[in-house]
A protein has these predicted regions:
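Active-site nucleophile/metal-coordination loop of metallo-enzymes that catalyze phosphate/sulfate
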Residues: 2-52, 59-122
């Protein structure tokens, strides 16, 4: 017996999150490594830079940006400026809510470590 998994495209399989390989949790620690902050390494292989600007786009994934890039001219220009024409795709946190993803980005930890797995609106 099989069941459809919500949010998984037909023909794809659901994957368990891996916060050690190309993850949102690695972004700011890698940036710190690029900037030679003691105790941090560039685990994403970002390269060297005297300054770094991180741009957060909340909501669309890589697939939506590829399909609707015309609606995001800044991102379209950023992609075009890359030598291979693509930006690096990072995996988000699970669950992929804004609160969980921002806590993962800001702490460099997986949701099970930082404990923010959602939010409540009153």
């Amino acid at each position: 017996m099989s069941a459809a998994v919500s949010g998984v495209a037909p023909g794809e399989q659901a994957r368990l999150p891996d916060y050690t390989a190309g993850s949102l949790a690695q972004l700011l620690p890698s940036v710190a490594g690029v900037l030679d902050v003691p105790g941090h390494v560039d685990s994403l292989g970002l390269g060297s830079a005297p300054r770094v600007c991180t741009v957060l786009v909340d909501g669309p994934g890589a697939r939506l940006l590829a399909e609707r890039g015309g609606h995001a001219p800044f991102l379209r220009r950023a992609v075009a400026a890359q030598p291979d024409g693509v930006l690096r795709e990072l995996r988000t946190a699970v669950p992929s809510t804004t609160a969980t993803a921002l806590a993962t980005l800001g702490t460099g930890c997986a949701p099970g470590q930082h404990g923010v797995v959602g939010y409540t609106a009153f």
